[in-house]
Amino acid sequence: MREFKRTDRVADQLQQELAVLIQREIKDPRLGMVTVSSVKVSRDLGYADIYITLLGENDAARIDENLKVLRHARGFLRSQIANRIKLRHVPELRFHYDESVVRGQRLSSLIDEAVADDRRRHEDDDEDEVR
């Protein structure tokens, strides 16, 4: 069995190309600092789900606005990809907001809170034993 599947290689290549294209070629002022966090390509290479994050922005309205800009530019992006990557058929691009980063930050803050609470309890217990 092969080490890497073709869909994985295509997804990696799409991620690299889209990251460059979004930053350099889309001139829409509504577009924020978009990062392509991952790309998943269907087995038949018919479509690609592109997951993005926005640097420093978690507002739902801004996220929707950025997704709207990217969805509007998907034809342009697809044609640019066709010029850069040798594929018989360039997958249809479907953009999604990647909530895993936000969830990860939330989990991290919950862990930090739990550790701080535990330390406070430990300090309170130590003070009670001293008395």
UniProtKB/Swiss-Prot annotation:
It comes from the Bacteria. Keywords: Cytoplasm, Ribosome biogenesis. GO terms for biological process: maturation of SSU-rRNA. It is found in: Cytoplasm. GO terms for molecular function: ribosomal small subunit binding. One of its GO terms (cellular component) is cytosol. Transmembrane segments: none annotated. Its main location: cytoplasm. InterPro entries: KH_dom-like_a/b (IPR015946), RbfA (IPR000238), RbfA_dom_sf (IPR023799), Ribosome-bd_factorA_CS (IPR020053). Monomer. Binds 30S ribosomal subunits, but not 50S ribosomal subunits or 70S ribosomes. One of several proteins that assist in the late maturation steps of the functional core of the 30S ribosomal subunit. Associates with free 30S ribosomal subunits (but not with 30S subunits that are part of 70S ribosomes or polysomes). Required for efficient processing of 16S rRNA. May interact with the 5'-terminal helix region of 16S rRNA. PANTHER family: RIBOSOME-BINDING FACTOR A, CHLOROPLASTIC-RELATED. Belongs to the RbfA family. This is Ribosome-binding factor A. It comes from Chromohalobacter salexigens (strain ATCC BAA-138 / DSM 3043 / CIP 106854 / NCIMB 13768 / 1H11). The gene is rbfA.
